[in-house]
Structure formats: structure tokens, C-alpha cells
């Protein structure tokens, strides 16, 4: 890859291996790079250990979503999902285990897939993207068995509430929709942009990030990043972050968020911004926490750069991996 391509590279997605020792990242050129965290974090790490052990073209279009199961890395490109065995990737083999396409309404349509999550209760893969619908695939058989319709524009993000078995979806239409995964029926619809404390009409109404656990939901995008109590369906905290947020996670007593601007924002649940930690890319698309492996417990962020920043404690950048 030449200097011009590197200059215009964006990292859209990342996922840690089941063992927590490797990181996969997807970019706008359809490539997936696999990095060895154990090599990059070792005391005798060199510049070479910050480069991928493997880099391959997985899709024609950008890799907007990556997701790891117990054995495979799932990647989503334009209209298709591919699975790669982690054991084979580590051996530098890049043959896809399988590729599947959701049942789109027209054969001319090749919508991008923006988000994938697993429903651990029934081992279903939940997929959302450019056709405004949620597609559900049985991971055992590889068949798409249901479609959830309700969004009027494309879906950016998905989350799963395990206790209630509920799917949450956020879209360009400004709605967060909550679905019962047992019946595939809609349960609630929250139009975040209609709440005065969250609305930012100058940025639009789209919802680009979503995270949830039992009673709480984090969401943001055009509207301000906000924390919602799902029993009362009301925002309890609105975070005064200037740009649009693209990914947010809750970890212990912190909310960590990335979006426009070269930093990771650390927020407290009450609504205050505690710190903003500088990063290499000028804006960020993806933030991931590696909690599977205590030895390699890191936060990684990627965005409008060929570099992925690695934080060993979440308050400063330890190193940067690069495509």
C-alpha cells in the first residue's frame, strides 16, 4: 500500500481474539489487519512488533464491523458477512470459513452492514445496516431466519440486553428501537432528538452509538451523548461533549467515548467530563476494551489514520499499532 492510500486510510472496526492476545482491525479499503498484542506489549518490543502479523483484503468495500465468537472472526462488508477461523488467521491463513448474505428485498441492492452483535441466549447473529432492517441469522445452520422492520433509514448500531433478551438498534432516522428477541416484536421506540436536553439540530438526529446494561442505555450521535434510565424511558445525564460521538462504553465508574476530535473522553455517570486523553487520529470511529486477558488488558482506538492507539492504563497512550 502506497503513501497516498495510507494518508487516506480510516479504521472503522476492531475486535480482540477470544484469547485476548490478538487484535483484528478493519479499514476503508476492505482490509483486515491482525496484530499480536503480546508482541507489541512485550518489554523487548520493536517497531516491527507494532505492524500486523497478517494483512489481507476481506471485502470489496469498507469493513464497517468486526465481531469475535469463541472460534471465529466475523467481518462485514458491503452486503455480506464472512467468517475467518482465529486458529487459521494466527497461522496466517486467510481462507474464509464461510460467507453469507442477508435476504435483501431486491437483488440490485448491496447495502452496507454497519453493526453485528451475538445474542448469546440462542446463538443468533444480529445484523443491521443500509437496508433499514435487522436481519437475524442462526449461527448453527447459517440461515437467515427473520427480519425486524421499523427503522425508516439505515441502522448504525446495535446492542443487546441479556437479562431481558432485548435488541436495541440506533439509526439515521434518529430512533432507538427496542425489540423482544423472543417474539421479534418492537417493544419501545425512543426518538432521542425530540428531547430538548439531548437535541442538537445543527448536527442532525442520527444515532451512531449505543451501549446498554439491564436498566441503563448510553446513546449519542447527532444528539448529545446521554445516559438513559430504561424503566422510566428518560435521560438522566447529558454529557457536554462538543462533537458527534461514534462509540461509547461503560467501564466500572467511567463512560469512555470517541467521535469527532483527537481524544478519548472520560465521563462520570453524573454527566461531567473528567478527562480527554489525546490520540493520534484527528477523529475516531472505534473504541474497544480487551477485558478477556488480564495480561493484555488494553483499550484500543482507531479512526481517520492508519494508526491504532493502544492504552495500557486508560489515561495515556502507550503505543500505536499501524497498518
Swiss-Prot record:
One of its GO terms (cellular component) is THO complex. Keywords: Apoptosis, Developmental protein, mRNA processing, mRNA splicing, mRNA transport, Nucleus, Repeat, RNA-binding, Transport, WD repeat. Gene3D superfamilies: YVTN repeat-like/Quinoprotein amine dehydrogenase. Its main location: nucleus. This is THO complex subunit 6 homolog. The keyword RNA-binding applies. One of its GO terms (molecular function) is RNA binding. GO terms for biological process: apoptotic process; mRNA export from nucleus; mRNA processing; RNA splicing. It comes from Danio rerio. Component of the THO subcomplex, which is composed of thoc1, thoc2, thoc3, thoc5, thoc6 and thoc7. Component of the transcription/export (TREX) complex at least composed of alyref/thoc4, ddx39b, sarnp/cip29, chtop and the THO subcomplex. WD repeats lie at residues 6-45, 58-96, 108-147, 150-189, 200-238, 279-321. It is found in: Nucleus; Nucleus speckle. Component of the THO subcomplex of the TREX complex which is thought to couple mRNA transcription, processing and nuclear export, and which specifically associates with spliced mRNA and not with unspliced pre-mRNA. Plays a key structural role in the oligomerization of the THO-DDX39B complex. PROSITE patterns: WD_REPEATS_1, WD_REPEATS_2, WD_REPEATS_REGION. Belongs to the WD repeat THOC6 family.
